[in-house]
Amino acid sequence: MIDREVLLRVTQRCEELRIRLVLDECFIEFLPVPERYSMLRETERYHRLFILRAFTKIYAMPGLRLGYGLSSDDELLEKMQHMRQPWSVSVPAQEAGIAALDEDEYIR
């Protein structure tokens, strides 16, 4: 894992240089203290930061392909919305994702 302070410096530098930084946090929930490494709270502060997360890893449902991205860049999110397929998430994946959100005990 990359130290959070290093990530903050990299994120700041990317912001200064107008470079989009994409961080894959799909496995972060497997860490003992995920909050220590996550940059999720920094998306409001850093406009060019984009974070990837997935249900498929932590909830053990890899065949369903359910993930999401987080960013405070409304322009980017709007462009992504216009480019996506209307059926980008299958009904079984949607149902499994909704059910997974109620499984706090499984995550612990």
Task: Give residue ranges: language-model regions.
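PLP-dependent aminotransferase class I/II
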Residues: 48-108
